[in-house]
Amino acid sequence: MRAATGVQYELTAETPSGPAAAVITEVAAGLRAYSVNGIDLVETFPAESPPPKGAGIVLVPWPNRIRDGVWVQRGVKRQLALSEPALRNASHGLLRFAPYREIGRTPGSVSLAATVFPQTGYPFQLDTEVTYALVADGLEVTHVLRNVGEADAPVALGTHPYLKIGDVPTGDLVLRLAAGTHIEVDDRMNPVGESPVDGTPFDLRAGRRVGDLDLDDGFGAVEATDGRGEHSLTAPDGRSVILWGDENMRYVQAFTPRNFPITVGDGEPVTGQAVAIEPMTAPANAFNTGAGLRWLTPGETWTVRWGIRHRGF
């Protein structure tokens, strides 16, 4: 049976922490697996299955949602397809089900490319590239977006990895988000406000146990140190997995579903809690609010980087 996510690009490298391995998918240029010294650091899923709850996929030219799939450009109303019909939103961009093509490969890296062609609601053309590379201290991901059309194009970018630390129950991990604001949403998960997290249950800067959280929430004002904002999960024994984003990743979505199909070893998936830490350059509904939205001029290129590293093992 052919994999539901197309070609599976298997990466391997020797690192100071031991052998590292990753699997990247042709469809959505997704991160299907990543491990160091045999310890899984992202939730994986069978090759014959679609990504559960968007696991690992690239979100472009917007992450999260656009209310009603509608946005207005200089007085012209644009209508996108409603890819989240239950909530009447356009969700997670235009390439989540698209195949990418290979443009570069080494044993420890792969570069994939896909084009966003002009279409209903998005009359622009973007060339997109993503490179996954196993490096000494983790996994580094580089996105390059280029406007190859004739008009300024609105763009934003995000990714959807679910992090873990081996067989440690997700509920026992401590989630830390380096974010200073929380984004309030309506019943359709679109922003209605943004408030400081100080003194609220959404202040995760000091960390909270994942099992005590029920989140599908956006956060802003990501605090960067040396050009990177860092969010983490920490196990009771002190081991941590850290997701970092460059200065473009000023927002993050945290999602803690309790009905994720957890895969353990070669066994059948079992339902359990997972945690996605989704770095984003813009929050939900950015095409309407303008928050974090980037307009690329014809011929302009934009590079965004993020990655995963580990500590304590």
Language-model segments: residues:
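Extended, loop-rich substrate-binding clefts of extracytoplasmic carbohydrate-active enzymes
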Residues: 1-3, 81-136
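Short, Gly/Pro- and small/polar-rich lid/capping loops
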Residues: 1-16
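Acidic, contiguous internal or C-terminal segments within carbohydrate-active enzymes
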Residues: 13, 21-22, 116-167
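Short Pro-Gly-centered flexible turn/kink motifs
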Residues: 71-79, 143, 295-312
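A short, structured loop/turn motif at beta-sheet edges
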Residues: 72-76, 102-110, 133-138, 167-168, ...
